[in-house]
């Protein structure tokens, strides 16, 4: 192996025969040896083909030649293995075909240009008559059998993208560096059997100036304004996209395919040679595809070639304008859009165009140019890239990243810290880093836009997936289903005939046809059960070709079941069935899951701690045999996280691990390293320390949920003893709750370390009869790591310890000292007492001021300043804590630095859309809009500045609108109350036209009928009292109760005077001013005659005096400002009588202790009558009334009111 220096230059032999027109002809012969002078450090190697174990098979490498090699025999033809030794390392490559790089039907087109002198450099007119034209010279399928991807055997995190079309060529990404490999000479496939020399060089060793990518993209669509005339060309395509759905096969979830048109100009073809350029480009795109498969991206994207076009000389120079990258990109995008297949389902329809050239289209160092977020756009989904070897794959990936929506790291995002580590979207590509990756910002920006790129959802590859029948039993007879259920030979039982063979499937074996078996299940739906019939839902039914599909729908949830554990966090479930309705005839099943779960019994177990997983393993001790022997089974945590919810146990006797062929019980902890996440139906469910599903809360070092270690204390010490006799010798105790426990010997000794559970007496480590050997085991619900190295023992566990443990030694020699050092972390409330055993409490954590961040720049442009922000950091774990932990007088002074030094742009007036008009007509309508003075920034955003910085007049922000006369409208008042108290009546309202007789439409009605409850039609059986004939009482006929009592007398009177005392019901019972004991007994109405309802609150009334029938001591209640004339009283009494909320009482003018008496003897007699008629107790001097649960004693003085006499 020879390490060549920078000065070693390989000879380059080029022989080109050109045609008369200056172009390369068909007979062109090109041999180009690699320009290895560009590489500062490289090695010449001879790769070999090997098998999986790395054993030599042959020197044959190329795909076209491997078929002829008799020695190239592999047990798996889908894999290839090669050995390469370079830079002191052995690379055992494991490769598989990259079947996702070239789409089916992909082609290579060779374009030829016919020229008219003088016009070949005009990139705009090259399609005019008499100018340059081109035609397809030939088309051939794009070869797909020599692109491979893979990794390096036994080295995790590596990737390889290599082609073996002509030797090995491509990229090897190891654990700490990236290498390129390619054959030293091309076209030597037939000479490989003797060994073929290749060049391997580091990517960081490619000699080139730093590549400035800071100006390699367009921000806005207007930057490609020269393509506006393509709007007409692609109008039909947009219409087709909107009116029809693409019928291409849909890719899987989170799987995206960029179907690429690869355009290659003549400069690239000439440099690599027509015979080799296709293989080179295939290798280059294989590397690009692998870059997009890096797991740091977070999204799986395939770069798929659907078409490759090799351009002729004239077309190539017409597209690229030297020194004008914007115009060159415009020409390339125009050309790519013109190559698009109009049929969306065409196999060559592309999503994105990549153009490669070796011409200088921009200033020195510019390697690419692309628009941002142009993916899937018919014009803007394209990139212009300078091809310069395999390292150009990173330029292509970088520019395509812009089209996908990614921006430069550190420009407009906070990922500038990742550029020095080799991020793909770094603005300055120096090729001096070791491993590429996608920054976190690139992943976030991609995920922000990727879901809007519908064109990437197509799957260009054919999949031979069989179409499943709508009913599963169509393809399987009952005999076949019997064979599946019970084994070879079983068929449907014919010993007895069932009424319906679809109820249950019975099977028997020909050796014993009368012995029938069943699994108590029906045959599959669709199983033929008779001629023209099939089984469906347990019934033999006639086949109906026109059966309509019925999608399923979920039924209701059941109640939650019992908890899987009585303590220590269990799980309970509830379920639902897809039966509302059930899916039939191929209908869709119900979406979503059929069960839900929640945590239950999350409190810790009160009794002695027991490991739930260990209990499940112990239950197998009595009946589970492994290798024909019973074992004592201990819990075992599988290293594969996907299998930690499967029950694996470890034999205490042999150490063998056995799978118990079942899942762990729901509520079992997934891992001993995570005390909260649990297994639910075989899946690990993340649970935080707050015992909430999906929570990210974690414990600090001493078990405080969401803590910051401020309550944690570290206890450490050294204990030395010299044994005088054999037998276990106690050294010290470790209390429960201890975490991060470390016990180790200070020096080699013959003694053996042992651990004992103080609560149970069980030996955790090195009990009697056990062999002391290094191992990792589980006990006391935690994982222990016991290690013996050079006769020095150590024991570690993360804990926490659920029980106290005793640390002992097993002496092997007398009078030999044993010295143990221990250290653990515990909560400050559980710190043990410090004694003379040399146990000390470690000092509290120390803190320091550390740079936290930089402040926001004082100016967005034109040169501003930003200052350092310091925070308080704990030294033990470098975690930022509250600033109060650090000494304020030691805080460093802020450091200032310049920022945003780019020149500011001129602010502009920006007016937003007008708001809606405030009126639809009239003379006062106006509308507003927001007008701001904005300054465009270089990152594409704007900032608002003071209006004084904007030039020109400020656009108006308010203007009149809809200033037209409003049409005249009819105005209507409220409807009056019904004219009657029962039966049919009328309501009236006022209708006016403010514009005379010029109102639009018909005049609204001013009178309408009203319907009240039917009047009382009970037959009148005559007056029930002789007092009914008294004229002085005739005014009470309007009261329903009195009218019923004196129906004969009231019916004889044509008109009835209003009652002298009225009071509408108040909003609360206390608003009714009443005291039956203070009223004339002749005027107290029986409550039973006047129903009281609380359904409709009535309006309050004020009291005023009135001189009318009833005497000077009579009072009536009226609405404020109402007229107390007889008509009003008559109308009010009628309304009061028909109201459901009215209660009639009297209000005296004299103080409550006096009684008011009528002046006639007849009225005195009437008082006696009414008192006797109050069967419910209205004459009682103490009455109670219930309303809203309150008891009111009417003997107490009433609420004060203003009374006028």
UniProtKB/Swiss-Prot annotation:
- List the cysteine pairs that form cystine: 333-382, 376-455, 415-441, 482-507, 493-516, 502-535, 529-540, 563-600, 567-605, 578-590, 978-1010, 982-1015, 993-999
The keyword Repeat is annotated on this UniProt entry:
yes
Tissue-by-tissue expression: Found in cartilage and skin.
Q: Quote the record's cofactor note.
A: Binds 1 zinc ion per subunit.
Compositionally biased region (Basic and acidic residues): 1185-1205
What cofactor does this chain's UniProt record say it requires? Zn(2+)
Q: Which residues form the active site?
A: 399
Residues of the signal sequence? 1-20
Q: Does the keyword Cytoplasm apply?
A: no
Domain Disintegrin span(s) in chain numbering: 470-550
TSP type-1 domain ranges (all copies): 551-606, 845-905, 906-965, 966-1014
Renumbered to this chain, region (Spacer) spans 713-844
Which GO terms fall under biological process for this protein?
Answer: collagen biosynthetic process; collagen catabolic process; collagen fibril organization; extracellular matrix organization; in utero embryonic development; positive regulation of vascular endothelial growth factor signaling pathway; protein processing; proteolysis
What segment(s) does the record annotate as region Disordered? 1174-1205
Which residues are noted in the entry as Zn(2+)-binding? Answer: 398, 402, 408
Question: Mind listing the UniProt keywords for this protein, alphabetically?
Answer: Cleavage on pair of basic residues, Disease variant, Disulfide bond, Extracellular matrix, Glycoprotein, Heparin-binding, Hydrolase, Metal-binding, Metalloprotease, Protease, Repeat, Secreted, Signal, Zinc, Zymogen
Outcome of altering residue 168 to P? Answer: In HKLLS3; affects proteolytic maturation and impairs secretion
Where in the numbering of this chain does the PLAC domain appear? 1015-1054
One annotated GO molecular function is: zinc ion binding
Of the GO CC terms on this record, one is:
extracellular region
Q: Which residues form the propeptide?
A: 21-249
Please give the clinical condition linked to this protein: Hennekam lymphangiectasia-lymphedema syndrome 3: A form of Hennekam lymphangiectasia-lymphedema syndrome, a generalized lymph-vessels dysplasia characterized by intestinal lymphangiectasia with severe lymphedema of the limbs, genitalia and face. In addition, affected individuals have unusual facies and some manifest intellectual disability. HKLLS3 is characterized by widespread congenital edema, facial dysmorphism and protein-losing enteropathy of variable severity. HKLLS3 transmission pattern is consistent with autosomal recessive inheritance.
Q: Which PANTHER family match?
A: A DISINTEGRIN AND METALLOPROTEINASE WITH THROMBOSPONDIN MOTIFS 3, ADAMTS A DISINTEGRIN AND METALLOPROTEASE WITH THROMBOSPONDIN MOTIFS PROTEASE
Q: What the protein does?
A: Cleaves the propeptides of type II collagen prior to fibril assembly. Does not act on types I and III collagens.
What domain comment accompanies this record? The spacer domain and the TSP type-1 domains are important for a tight interaction with the extracellular matrix.
Protein's name in the database: A disintegrin and metalloproteinase with thrombospondin motifs 3
Recorded source organism is Homo sapiens (Human)
Question: Quick one: which gene encodes this?
Answer: ADAMTS3
